[in-house]
């Protein structure tokens, strides 16, 4: 792993990123979830190192150490990544997105097809504004979407109120209690009993909240907006992985996404949930991605 580095954007803005895996390997841009940050890519480090994969994991604008970009759109992301790629001396690349990182990987694939070889979408977020029936979403997501539409200022206040608590690091002895409070699928709870996996998931979330509530909110707003392109515009190979026990985004929603992608190889994994899929299957995911 390499220490955090920064790429200069327009004006005084910067984007922070870290690298994992093999520094001389096949380049893969990692798109973290929400709320999360670049250190979520710790999940990839050992398998990426063994497989000869170079993981470049940036914080999105406003997250952790990257500068806030108010009112940003999903369409702004490819330009940020171009700066990161040029800074790192990378031409063609692949992308790996987990959960809320999915729209960002799709955006790169749709607008940078000359550089994107393939993308892997793992328990990925779907185009939420296109949903006619939101029952396949986690209830918390349904509630936030409804509040964003009806009382956005209240939602912003709630984010600011939650930040001091969600930025805290809970004592190790309280982790079992935290896992019970989250009401996770058994497969997810079991996977998160691994200390390294727990840290990769939850420390990356805490880093996001420590940055600012405004940054987390700006990232959340992306999901409540049109993407600016359709899934049918993504012509690069897509490797879609989704657990049949996923509570955040039902695998039925993922099946509909797979049908719309022109070049998609989808795998729906039994007894895998939103957390256990990337924790248990990262080696297979990376092997499949670099072979595309």
Question: What is each residue range found by the language model?
Answer:
Residues 140-229:
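Alpha/beta-hydrolase
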Residues 76-94:
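Conserved acidic catalytic loop of the alpha/beta-hydrolase fold
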Residues 24-25, 32-37, 99, 244:
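Active-site glycine-rich loops that stabilize anionic/oxyanionic intermediates
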């Amino acid at each position: 792993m390499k220490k955090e580095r920064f790429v200069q954007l327009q004006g005084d803005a910067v984007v922070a990123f870290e690298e994992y895996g093999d520094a001389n390997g096949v380049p893969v841009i990692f798109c973290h979830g929400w709320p999360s940050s670049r250190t979520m890519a710790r999940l990839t480090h050992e398998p990426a190192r063994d497989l000869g994969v170079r993981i470049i994991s940036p914080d999105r604008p406003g997250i952790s150490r990257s500068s806030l970009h108010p009112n940003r759109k999903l369409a702004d992301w490819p330009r940020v990544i171009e700066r990161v790629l040029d800074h790192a001396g990378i031409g063609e690349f692949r992308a790996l997105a987990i959960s809320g990182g999915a729209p960002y990987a799709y955006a790169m694939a749709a607008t940078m097809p000359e550089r994107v070889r393939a993308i892997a979408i793992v328990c990925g977020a779907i185009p939420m504004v296109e949903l006619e029936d939101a029952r396949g979403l986690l209830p918390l997501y349904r509630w936030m979407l409804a509040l964003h539409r009806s009382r956005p200022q209240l939602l912003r206040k709630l984010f600011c109120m939650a930040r001091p608590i969600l930025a805290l690091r809970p004592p190790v002895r309280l982790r079992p209690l935290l896992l019970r409070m989250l009401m996770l699928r058994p497969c997810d709870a079991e996977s998160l009993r691994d200390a390294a996996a727990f840290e990769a998931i939850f420390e990356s979330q805490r880093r996001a909240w420590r940055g600012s509530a405004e940054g987390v909110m700006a990232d959340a707003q992306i999901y409540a907006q049109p993407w600016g392109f359709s899934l049918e515009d993504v012509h690069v190979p897509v490797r879609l992985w989704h657990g049949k026990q996923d509570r955040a985004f039902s695998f039925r929603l993922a099946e509909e996404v797979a049908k719309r992608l022109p070049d998609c190889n989808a795998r729906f994994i039994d007894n895998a949930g939103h957390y256990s899929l990337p924790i248990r299957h990262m080696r297979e995911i990376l092997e499949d991605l670099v072979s595309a």
